[in-house]
Design a protein with these regions (language model features):
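Conserved Rossmann-fold SDR core element
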Residues: 68, 78-95, 133-137
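C-terminal helical subdomain
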Residues: 89, 97, 101-147
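Short-chain dehydrogenase/reductase
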Residues: 24, 71, 119
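Catalytic loop of short-chain dehydrogenase/reductase
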Residues: 1-18, 28, 32-81
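Conserved internal alpha-helix within the Rossmann fold of NAD(P)-dependent oxidoreductases
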Residues: 19-24, 122
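Short connector loops/turns at beta-strand edges and beta->alpha or beta->beta junctions
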Residues: 45-47, 93-97
């Protein structure tokens, strides 16, 4: 809690919540309503309130929880005009990037993914979506992440 700062909180919310909200605002209405389509937002498991067992990462967790609510809202609103579109969140897993470097030592060997593995896994999730999945957040392995 000591590390919370207003400036950092605003920065993280701008990147992880407000940016995606504006992307959704302008692009979701453009989805074809005559053919099935999927709009996926990059979310994270740490945005799940019920899955939070460790605390910490206050701004990041709050920004992703907020994004997950937007995903649900967008799915509900889009379904009123486009029954064939799905709006989902995708958790890529822990990907070997600069962002994950500080905590990679705590990640099990088989749970640190290459960007290519993660991208392929998320594409497979999209391919396996079913009716009723819009508004949900899915992990790279296809499991649904609870709110």
């Amino acid at each position: 809690m000591k590390q919370i700062s207003a400036d950092n909180f605003k920065k993280v919310l701008n990147i992880n919540t407000i940016g995606p909200a504006l992307v959704g605002k302008f692009f979701l209405p453009l989805l074809d309503n005559k053919n099935p389509s999927v709009f996926g937002f990059l979310s994270a498991r740490v945005g799940s309130i019920s899955d939070n067992k460790l605390g910490g990462w206050h701004a990041y967790r709050a920004s992703k929880a907020s994004l997950n609510m937007l995903i649900k809202n967008f799915a509900i609103e889009l379904a009123r005009t486009n029954k064939l579109a799905k709006v989902i969140g995708l958790h890529p897993g822990t990907v070997d990037t600069d962002l994950s470097k500080p905590f990679q030592k705590n990640v099990p060997d088989n749970k640190l993914f290459t960007p290519q593995f993660s991208a392929d896994a998320m594409i497979n999730v999209v391919r396996g979506l079913k009716d009723g999945d819009s508004g949900s957040v899915f992990a790279f392995d296809g499991s649904k992440i609870e709110s």
